[in-house]
From Swiss-Prot:
It comes from Prochlorococcus marinus (strain MIT 9312). Signal peptide: none annotated. Coiled coil: none annotated. The lineage of its organism: Bacteria, Bacillati, Cyanobacteriota, Cyanophyceae, Synechococcales. This is Cytochrome c biogenesis protein CcsA. Its main location: membrane. One of its GO terms (cellular component) is plasma membrane-derived thylakoid membrane. GO terms for molecular function: heme binding.
Amino acid sequence: MILDNLFKNLIYDPVSALGILVFYILLVNLPISLGAVFKKKSFFIVKLLTILVNLLITLQLLFRWSISGHFPVSNLYESLYFLAWGISMGQLYIEREYSSPIIPSIAIPIELLTVAFACFVLPDDLKLSSNLVPALRSSWLVMHVSVVMLSYAALIIGSLLSASVLFINRNKPLQIRSSSTGIGGFKFFNNNYLNDLADPVEFSHSEELDTLSYRSILIGFVLLTLGLISGAVWANEAWGTWWSWDPKETWAFITWLFYAAYLHMRISKGWQGRRPALLATSGFLVVIVCYLGVNFLGIGLHSYGWIFG
């Protein structure tokens, strides 16, 4: 019955139908991904389903783009699916570098929650595409919003990877060798390994995850920086001001400062182990408030719509 309705809706409303189909695939993939942590044979199935999810979201966004005539990040519904697309793409990319079932086990639940929020929590009127106001009919829409959303995806993945490091080492001391570059990281590496340069160094599972977390956050920070700069340029063109302290702008700046502090502590101060992992993990809440918190306020130029309105 569900499949029949989905296939019928694919003809009349392909965007919504594909969105719901993505939800059901993620719902199936969730227990498989969690089980793959203990039974690695199912890891391949998890990866195939993630690829399918990413392709279906790509198709959904292309349909919305074709129907609306503008890049599909103009409302909360579209941006949620774009975020899910970014997280799934990041998950697949990281799995190419380091094949671990831990990665999908933390990424897929967030993808599922994101899609479920878009499908079943948002009011129907916020799911509809609408004409853009003149200020948003700009090529900056693609540059600014897409880069910021991808930065959120990278920062979320990095924060969750740090959370996984803390969980794996919850009942034992967390010793992480340096995975950062810079003065502090060099000093730490130099003090511990200068006498062992002739020997190959094998990093533990936690150290690999910590390295992936650091790199993901670094990429997210760079993207967020580009997003803030492009947003300022766009705002100046559209409204004649570079910065207006809009709630979203303010929280984006707070998010930027938060992760700048994290990177400073790792690169310059040589922080390793539990402290940076705790800081990165708490960054997840900062990103969520930045992305969704403004929508609960229902104010500001960046509000996608008050979900209770």
